[in-house]
């Protein structure tokens, strides 16, 4: 992964994986290249909360990753609340996979954002592959200052421009979802979205650097 990052001029990557120890090892080996976020399954209850606290304190992880599709929950389910509470207490952003029914729909993520307005939420894939969900991600995020959009896997280049111009120029992040998606493909989609160079620089790196205080 580091070799591919070098090939495409990527300075740092925000990474997560179902097995947090894999990310621990990557961050330990390449502390200047990787920023870890903790994969958390809300069904694990107190164990999940303890994992988040440990990864932040012992391994300098900087956020929480929730995957409603893989772990079979909806973001607006109360089972998620203990993790959101620790996110609020520790000022951790929460990255949430979006786009796949019935578990990962944008409206359920927005409902969670309404319940926890002090927690910064990143809607990963900004609705993903369905135009209806992509538009919902944009339209709903406009109304909630604590919601940010990440671009990986979202196929409509014009929606990156729309999100940047309507949701906010500090609230859209480029992402790769590597190794599932190719760095260059994800880059090209953003490059051709019709925004000026200064805006592309915000999306590609300035916004996430500011967001995570890197």
What do the PLM-derived regions correspond to, one by one?
Residues 1-12, 169-171, 184-214:
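Mid-to-C-terminal alpha-helical segments outside catalytic/metal-binding sites
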Residues 5, 13, 23, 36, ...:
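Divalent metal-coordination and catalytic microenvironments
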Residues 5, 27-31, 56, 113-114, ...:
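N-terminal cationic-hydrophobic initiation segments that often serve targeting/anchoring roles
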Residues 11-12, 19-95, 143, 147:
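Active-site gating/metal-coordination segments in enzymes
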Residues 16, 37-39, 65-67, 95-97, ...:
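A cross-family glycoside hydrolase active-site/sugar-binding cleft signature
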Residues 19, 42, 68-70, 100-102, ...:
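Active-site-proximal loop/turn and secondary-structure-junction residues that shape catalytic pockets
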Residues 45-50, 74, 131-134, 159-160, ...:
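Short, charged, surface-exposed secondary-structure boundary motifs
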Residues 76-174:
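Catalytic pocket-lining loop regions of alpha/beta-barrel enzymes
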């Amino acid at each position: 992964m580091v070799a591919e990052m070098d090939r495409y001029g990527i300075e740092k990557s925000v990474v997560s994986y179902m097995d947090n120890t894999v990310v621990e090892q990557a961050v330990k080996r390449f502390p200047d290249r990787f920023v870890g976020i903790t994969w958390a399954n809300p069904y694990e209850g107190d164990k999940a909360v303890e994992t988040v606290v440990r990864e932040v304190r012992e391994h300098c992880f900087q956020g929480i990753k929730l995957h409603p599709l893989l772990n079979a929950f909806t973001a607006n389910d109360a089972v998620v609340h203990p993790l959101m509470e620790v996110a609020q207490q520790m000022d951790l952003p929460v990255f949430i996979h979006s786009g796949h029914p019935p578990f990962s729909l944008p409206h359920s993520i927005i409902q969670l954002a309404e319940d926890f307005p002090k927690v910064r939420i990143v809607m990963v894939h900004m609705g993903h592959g369905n135009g209806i969900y992509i538009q919902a991600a944009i339209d709903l995020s406009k109304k909630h200052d604590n919601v940010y959009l990440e671009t990986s896997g979202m196929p409509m280049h014009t929606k990156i421009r729309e999100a940047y111009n309507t949701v906010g120029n500090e609230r859209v992040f480029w992402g790769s979802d590597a190794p599932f998606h190719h760095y260059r493909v994800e880059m090209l989609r953003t490059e051709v979205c019709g925004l000026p160079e200064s805006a592309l620089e915000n999306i590609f790196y300035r916004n996430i650097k500011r967001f995570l205080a890197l």
